[in-house]
């Protein structure tokens, strides 16, 4: 475990959580039970998605990103659907690269929209974000407010974290 962390890799311990590299302390541990956040993106936006993954993890969330979580030999369509279904939030990263592109990104969005049908209407599940000045698909834009991560990345991330935390607080209050 230590060697992997020193090499800059995260190490997931089933049933417990994830050890992650940390520049200040060497590593940090994220226990299971943290709110799960699925990140959907196109491969051209992988660097931005990885930055968002890091920001969410640093804020105490457990992000899910295919490049970080899929295992060799794993059935990736099934793993992705399971991850979306188990997530507390689904962040769709739209950009000029994703506009009109066919493939896995679109399938993930469609599956998330199906999952959202099972969630109470006033709960937030899908959080669309724009990585650049692109068009958000009409079906999404007509129903769900998006957040811009440009030109001020930090401000956009703070807005995402704020809305997710308010939702989690509301869900906890509703259970008690």
Where are these regions (language model features)?
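Glycine-rich, charge-decorated loop segments at or immediately adjacent to ligand/cofactor-binding or catalytic sites
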Residues: 133-144
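Short, polar/flexible loop-turn hinges at active-site or ligand-entry regions and domain interfaces
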Residues: 99-100, 119, 147-151
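Conserved N-terminal substructure of TIR/SEFIR domains
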Residues: 34-93, 97, 113, 117-125, ...
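Extended, charge-enriched "interface" segments that sit outside catalytic cores
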Residues: 129
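Output/docking surface of receiver
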Residues: 143-160
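Strongly charged
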Residues: 1-35
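Glycine/threonine-rich flexible loop motifs
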Residues: 100-107
């Amino acid at each position: 475990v230590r060697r992997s962390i020193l090499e800059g890799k995260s190490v997931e311990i089933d049933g417990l959580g994830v050890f992650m590299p940390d520049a200040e302390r060497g590593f940090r541990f994220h226990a299971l039970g943290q709110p799960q956040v699925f990140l959907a993106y196109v491969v051209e936006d992988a660097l931005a998605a990885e930055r968002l993954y890091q920001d969410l993890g640093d804020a105490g969330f457990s992000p899910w990103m295919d490049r970080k979580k899929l295992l060799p030999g794993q059935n990736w369509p099934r793993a992705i659907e399971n991850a979306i279904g188990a997530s507390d939030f689904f962040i769709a990263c739209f950009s000029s690269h994703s506009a009109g592109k066919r493939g896995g990104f679109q399938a993930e969005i469609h599956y998330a929209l199906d999952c959202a049908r099972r969630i109470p209407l006033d709960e937030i599940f899908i959080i669309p974000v724009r990585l650049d000045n692109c068009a958000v698909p009409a079906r999404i834009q007509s129903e769900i407010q998006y957040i811009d991560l440009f030109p001020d990345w930090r401000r956009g991330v703070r807005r995402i974290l704020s809305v997710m935390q308010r939702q989690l607080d509301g869900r906890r209050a509703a259970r008690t």
